[in-house]
Amino acid sequence: MAKKVLGFIKLQIPAGAANPAPPVGPALGQKGVNIMEFCKQFNAKTQSEAGMIIPVVITVYSDKSFTFITKTPPAAVLLLKEASLKKGSGEPNRNKVGTVTRDQVRKIAELKMPDLNAVNSEGAEEMIMGTARSMGIVVEG
């Protein structure tokens, strides 16, 4: 018989840097998950992407075991990295803080494709460009 699912936990954790401190510890502790075991597995799986924020969905089962799925970094984080910025604009409609090229948007869209609900790459690019606009980043080309 399959294990009964107790719940799901969604977190965004820096790659290779999961530790028992908040927000990881309290979120997992509430469901009774072995926090150190999760941290070891997550850090081992995401070591190659150091420095990026990685969304993770943790499935917790009734016997306190767990599985997790890592997703691609958020589009906003990827756009900031491509534009070499620390943060987006506080007033995106007035203050533009950086620019990215259409090729950079295409690269981000291809990377994000598995997590986006887009039919094709053009739709994915439009989503990424919308995110860029809402952050005050101009898309050239």
From Swiss-Prot:
GO CC field:
cytosolic large ribosomal subunit
Q: Which Pfam families does the protein's record reference?
A: Ribosomal_L11, Ribosomal_L11_N
Record GO biological process: translation
Q: How is it modified after translation?
A: One or more lysine residues are methylated.
Which keywords has UniProt assigned to this entry? Methylation, Ribonucleoprotein, Ribosomal protein, RNA-binding, rRNA-binding
* Listed GO MF terms: large ribosomal subunit rRNA binding; structural constituent of ribosome
Which family is this protein grouped under? Belongs to the universal ribosomal protein uL11 family.
Subunit architecture = Part of the ribosomal stalk of the 50S ribosomal subunit. Interacts with L10 and the large rRNA to form the base of the stalk. L10 forms an elongated spine to which L12 dimers bind in a sequential fashion forming a multimeric L10(L12)X complex.
What role does this protein play?
A: Forms part of the ribosomal stalk which helps the ribosome interact with GTP-bound translation factors.
Listed name of the protein: Large ribosomal subunit protein uL11
